[in-house]
Amino acid sequence: MELWYTEEHTDKVRFSIKVDEQLYSGKSDFQRIDVFKSQEFGTFFTLDGLMMVTEKDEFIYHDMIVHVPMATNPNIKNVLVIGAGDGGTVRELTRYETIEKIDMVEIDKLVVDVCREYLPQTANKLDDPRVSLFFEDGLKFVRSVENKYDLIIVDSTDPFGPGEGLFTREFYGNCFKALKEDGILVNQHESPYYEEYARGMKRAHKRIKECFPVCRVYQAHIPTYPSGHWLFGFASKKYDPLNADIEKWNDLGLKTKYYNTELHKGCFALPNYVKEMLENVDE
């Protein structure tokens, strides 16, 4: 009998992957966690039936959420990562020798434990000596921090369930306070294509705009995420990613599979329908 993983992108659209075997299924205090093995996408894991990471395309997401801010300000030393239990964001950050400290706050320890066992491709740098793991609510964590971080990356689930609090105005305001005077905030910004996801994207963008003087959106193609068209939010107290001297990034000699400095400029060029959504977030 064939086994398929199927995810509802809307009540009228489904996305399926043929599965060789299910490697893990469990429930934490926060969510259901499943790990599958497939020929097309390798090992992949889901939370509450929603795709989080696949071995085949994770490099796209993790390249774009990390290297865009790091190229914008190469002097980043202290980083806060919220969510990111699979470890891929931390893995990319540890490639920068100039980074001195990475605090990772993940509400669900079981996610990290499962990814350490089944997804070493992404979780293999969580033991880097610069990394400190905190298993607590990211919303509460940033409330008590002030003027500490050069970069905050919000690598969260979608804006419902355990990740819901990470899309509020209070949260973004606390992130602003936790950042130093030239700090950068980057977050996964949902998809603009399907209505439910677009609603979440517009709501988050509106709230970030209310907190930060520099507020931009960039995009990437991620095949296993709803519609494949995925957005990231870039907010900053000082740096505009389109005016930064990003060519210095090339001198680092980092080998990436997706990100490059030409793409850095191009990824901020958005389709008209997305630009119109972002311009009309106040309506």
Curated annotation (Swiss-Prot):
For this entry, list what GO says about its biological process: spermidine biosynthetic process
The EC code for this enzyme is: 2.5.1.16
Q: Which residues bind spermidine?
A: H62, D86, D155, S156, T157, D158
Cross-referenced InterPro entries, in alphabetical order?
Answer: PABS, SAM-dependent_MTases_sf, Spermi_synthase, Spermidine_synt_N, Spermidine_synt_N_sf
Q: Which reaction(s) does the protein catalyse, per the Swiss-Prot or TrEMBL entry?
A: S-adenosyl 3-(methylsulfanyl)propylamine + putrescine = S-methyl-5'-thioadenosine + spermidine + H(+)
| Sites where the protein binds S-methyl-5'-thioadenosine | Q31, E106, D137, G138, P162
Stated family: Belongs to the spermidine/spermine synthase family.
Functional note:
Catalyzes the irreversible transfer of a propylamine group from the amino donor S-adenosylmethioninamine (decarboxy-AdoMet) to putrescine (1,4-diaminobutane) to yield spermidine.
Name the UniProt record assigns to this protein: Polyamine aminopropyltransferase
Instruction: Give the originating organism.
Output: Clostridium perfringens (strain ATCC 13124 / DSM 756 / JCM 1290 / NCIMB 6125 / NCTC 8237 / Type A)
